[in-house]
From Swiss-Prot:
This is Peptide chain release factor 1. InterPro entries: PCRF (IPR005139), Pep_chain_release_fac_I (IPR000352), Pep_chain_release_fac_I_sf (IPR045853), Prokaryotic/Mito_RF (IPR050057), RF-1 (IPR004373). Methylated by PrmC. Methylation increases the termination efficiency of RF1. One of its GO terms (molecular function) is translation release factor activity, codon specific. Gene3D superfamilies: 3.30.160.20, 3.30.70.1660, 6.10.140.1950. The gene is prfA. It is found in: Cytoplasm. NCBIfam families: prfA, PRK00591.1. It comes from Mycobacterium avium (strain 104). Keywords: Cytoplasm, Methylation, Protein biosynthesis. It comes from the Bacteria. The modification N5-methylglutamine is found at residue 236.
């Protein structure tokens, strides 16, 4: 077993401490702290459970070997227990492999149109709907924070917040973190009169959302905050007050807009959360070469040559070029049936992490 005993001892102690804290009513007077503790407990529970099963199986194996020394009828039981111990040992090693520290986090997701004009914007809207439907299948909450629509109702740019409702160790980020990159579509555009298949692209950016804005250092003096009237599809005004908020982080030039909440105060709070997520991602890029390489796989410019996935409508085929995944159920995928693809991406990521360990 590759993990050191001290690591297990530390995790067992942390698990016991969290169990004690979660039984304390005072903790639940602070919902954010309770949720954070609950998520960590959910992360540790299967590890602790597997470790205890392994210890019990080892004791049973030792007993069976002692009995088999005097009675051959126990030989088969020894073989079964040896197999179980090996299986649990491997399972525990997998659980202790390096894990993304943001896996339990919620996300901010941006879709942007690129090459292809109106068709690209329509495809960007298709991607946004795909993610919304996937989130709905999992009981997650989706909020459209900002949207810039095209003449035909597509998305030039849209920002979504996707949040889970439970304390699962595998949160929204663990499932959707691989979506960042350029997505290419091959189909006959609605604007095409000759029936020819065109290729266009849209981009997706995904950021883990911090539990609290305070977790990310943001100096108020570094912010320029502008307010304006919210607008609906096609640029039509839907609010007679200046409730929309645009925040510019002057040192980095990052701009975040939020206009879909009901009040200026709510829009400002959500915009700050999105800004915190983006600044956190930038800080991690600078701090870690690995994180920088991962983020490099996301879009810098929406260029078809940087594609991570192709959606081929004539063949009803989806292809993820990073892992060679192919499936002929594009219609179902666009309706939010993404679990098979996400499972394959997660398995490839897990294998990579085990190799690093």
């Amino acid at each position: 077993m590759t993990q050191p005993v001290q690591t297990i001892d530390v995790l067992l102690a942390e698990h016991a401490d969290l169990e004690r804290r979660l039984s304390d009513p005072d903790l639940h007077s602070n919902p954010d702290e309770a949720r954070k503790a609950g998520r960590r407990f959910a992360r540790l529970a299967p590890i602790v459970g597997t470790y205890r099963k392994l210890m019990a199986a080892r004791e049973d194996l030792e007993t069976a070997r002692e009995l088999a020394a005097d009675d051959d009828s126990f030989t088969a039981e020894v073989a079964d227990l040896e197999s179980r111990v090996a299986q649990l040992d491997t399972q525990l090693t997998d659980m202790l492999a390096p894990r993304d520290s943001h896996d339990a986090d919620d996300i901010v997701l941006e879709v942007k149109s690129g090459e292809g004009g109106e068709e690209s914007a329509l495809f960007a809207a298709d991607l946004a709907r795909m993610y919304i439907r996937y989130a709905e299948r999992h009981g997650w909450t989706v909020t459209v924070l900002d949207e810039i629509t095209s003449d035909l109702g597509g998305y030039k740019d849209a920002t979504l917040s996707i949040r889970s409702k439970g304390d699962s160790a595998d949160g929204v980020w663990s499932r959707m973190k691989f979506e960042g990159g350029v997505h290419r579509v091959q189909r006959v555009p609605v604007t095409e009169s000759q029936g020819r298949v065109h290729t266009s692209a849209a981009g997706v950016l995904v950021y883990p959302e911090p539990e609290e804005v305070a977790e990310v250092q943001i100096d108020e003096s570094d912010l320029r905050i502008d307010v304006f009237r919210s607008s609906g599809k096609g640029g039509q005004g839907v609010n007679t007050t200046d409730s929309a908020v645009r925040i510019t982080h002057l040192p980095t030039g990052v701009v975040v807009t939020c206009q879909n909440e009901r009040s200026q105060l709510q829009n400002k709070a959500r915009a700050l959360q999105v800004l915190a997520a983006r600044l956190q991602a930038m800080a991690e890029e600078q701090a870690s070469a690995e994180a920088s390489a991962d983020r490099a796989s996301q879009i810098r410019t929406v260029d078809r040559s940087e594609r991570i996935r192709t959606y081929n409508f004539p063949e009803n085929r989806i292809t993820d070029h990073r892992i060679g995944f192919k499936a002929h159920n594009l219609d179902q995928v666009l309706d939010g049936d993404l679990d098979a693809l996400f499972d394959a991406l997660a398995a490839a990521d897990k294998q990579s992490r085990l190799q690093q360990a």
